[in-house]
Amino acid sequence: MVPKFYKLSNGFKIPSIALGTYDIPRSQTAEIVYEGVKCGYRHFDTAVLYGNEKEVGDGIIKWLNEDPGNHKREEIFYTTKLWNSQNGYKRAKAAIRQCLNEVSGLQYIDLLLIHSPLEGSKLRLETWRAMQEAVDEGLVKSIGVSNYGKKHIDELLNWPELKHKPVVNQIEISPWIMRQELADYCKSKGLVVEAFAPLCHGYKMTNPDLLKVCKEVDRNPGQVLIRWSLQHGYLPLPKTKTVKRLEGNLAAYNFELSDEQMKFLDHPDAYEPTDWECTDAP
C-alpha cells in the first residue's frame, strides 16, 4: 500500500500524486484541470514559468463553484513556483502577490517553491525571506524548493534567519535518473521528494525493461512509472494533455510492483535527465 497523502514537516497533508501542468497549451489547461479534479486529482502543480497559473486556477474554481456545499477549497492542494527573474527580496514580495492574484478565487497558495537555485546564494536567501513572510501573512501555507542539490539545502537549513523550513524538493527522478543520494538526503532532512518528469517526457515508453514489467502487471508504461515513484516514497507529477489518460494515471494507486520488479526497473548508475539540470549550480 502506498499512501494517498504524505504529511509535510509543518503538519499539512499533501496528496501523493499531482497533475503536472508544464507545456499544456494554455487554451486547454483549464479544461484538463477541471476534468482532473472531476476524476480524482486533488493536487495541481504549476509555475510562473508555465504561463498558465490563471488557467489552472480557473479549472479548480469551476469545480469548486459547481457544488459549493460539497466541493471544498481545503480538498485542493495548489502549488506554484517563483521564476529565476523573481528572485531577490523585493521582486519576490511582488511576485508572490501576483501569483495569488492570478488565482485569487483560491484565496491562498498551498505550496510555493523557488523554481531553481540558479540565481546564487544571496538572491536565494532573500527570496526565502520573502516566502517566509508570505507564510506569516497567510498568503501561502507551505514553502519549498525545486532543483536544489545538497549544498543548496544545507545553505538554507543552516541560514540563521530560517523560520519556516522547506517542506519539499522537486527534482527530476525516474528509473534512469534516480539521484538516490540526494533523494535520501532530502528525506533525512524532512523534505518530501517530488518527482517531476516521472514519465521521462515519453522518451522511455518503449524501453524493453519497462515493457517487460508492464506485461507482467498488465499496466501501461505511464502507470508503472508512476507506481515505481510512489513505491520509492516519492510524489510523482505526471502530466498529460489527454483527458482520457487522467484517470488512468491515478490507477497507479491500484496495483503493486514486487521487490524484484522494482529492482529490475532501478538503474542506479544511469544518468539520463530529460529536462534541465541545475542541482549542481554554484
Curated annotation (Swiss-Prot):
Q: Where is the signal peptide?
A: none
User: Could you name the domain of life of the organism this protein comes from?
Assistant: Eukaryota
**Which keywords does this Swiss-Prot/TrEMBL entry list?**
Oxidoreductase
Q: A biological process (GO) annotation for this entry?
A: D-xylose catabolic process
Q: Which residues form the active site?
A: 50 (proton donor)
**Record-linked CDD domains:** AKR_AKR1-5-like
Name any one GO molecular function. Answer: aldose reductase (NADPH) activity
Q: Which GO terms describe its cellular component?
A: cytoplasm; cytosol; nucleus
InterPro entries according to UniProt: AKR, Aldo/ket_reductase_CS, NADP_OxRdtase_dom, NADP_OxRdtase_dom_sf
Any extra detail in the entry? Present with 6960 molecules/cell in log phase SD medium.
What PANTHER family does its record include? 2,5-DIKETO-D-GLUCONIC ACID REDUCTASE, ALDO_KETO REDUCTASE FAMILY PROTEIN
Name by which UniProt lists this protein: Uncharacterized oxidoreductase YJR096W
Q: What organism does the UniProt record list as the source? A: Saccharomyces cerevisiae (strain ATCC 204508 / S288c) (Baker's yeast)
